[in-house]
Regions:
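A short, flexible low-complexity segment enriched in Lys/Arg and Gly/Pro that occurs
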Residues: 26-63
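Extended polybasic, low-complexity segments that bind anionic RNA or targeting/receptor surfaces
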Residues: 1-41, 87-202
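Glycine/serine-rich anion-binding loops at beta->alpha junctions
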Residues: 51-86
Length: 202
């Protein structure tokens, strides 16, 4: 194919610890929830009484003014004071690394079982042209897929990003969201050992 380099190597054996794991829906759901929660920015910031600057000095004396006593201008009762029960959220959801890896293996195994996972030869585009990506995917016979490679090749990434039905992912960066969103998964030969390392439960 013009503009596309394919490296022919012997097709590797699919390691059972990555592609022959029983699907665990509960574990996969937990991994997906954890991943999505950790992607949230949590940019909303409300200041409670302790977060507001100033207010170290008592605003006026305790008695003799006729006003209600006050100890600080940071009180929620004052204009410019803190917010009562400020909604300060940390969306981070931690998950045991071993469980997270098992969830990824579970997803990959499900794709293999359902015959939605295809091994392809290593590929790289000489130029970052969408046309080259279209020609490559047409040869695979799938109309929508996620291509997983051993490393993030810049030309390949740029060539694929304009295609709505196709995605590109470095094997080191696989996550439950992108995997589950895919209709079909294409895995390059050189990505197999990387995937094995990523989901390796020690």
């Amino acid at each position: 194919m013009a503009g596309t380099e394919t490296k022919k190597i012997t097709a590797p054996r699919l390691p059972s610890e990555v592609f022959s794991v029983e699907f665990n829906q509960s574990l996969v759901h937990q991994a997906l929830t954890s991943y999505l929660s950790n992607q949230r920015q949590g940019s909303v910031k409300l200041k409670n009484r302790s977060d507001v600057r100033g207010g170290g000095k008592k605003p006026f004396r305790q008695k003799g003014t006729g006003r209600a006593r006050a100890g600080t201008i940071r009180s929620p009762l004052w204009v410019g004071g803190g917010v009562t029960f400020a909604n300060i959220k940390n969306h981070e959801k931690k998950m045991n690394k071993k469980m997270a890896k098992k969830a990824l293996a579970s997803i990959l195994s499900k794709f293999k079982t359902e015959k939605r996972l295809t091994l392809v030869e290593d590929v790289s585009f000489k130029e970052p042209k969408t046309k080259l990506a279209v020609e490559f995917f047409n040869k695979t016979g799938v109309d929508s897929a996620l291509l997983i490679t051993s490393e993030a090749d810049q030309n390949t990434m740029l060539a694929i990003r304009n295609l709505k039905s196709f995605g590109f992912l470095d094997a080191k960066d696989i996550n439950p969201y992108d995997l589950l969103k895919a209709k079909h998964i294409l895995v390059t030969h050189s990505a197999i050992p990387v995937l094995k390392e990523v989901v390796n439960v020690k």
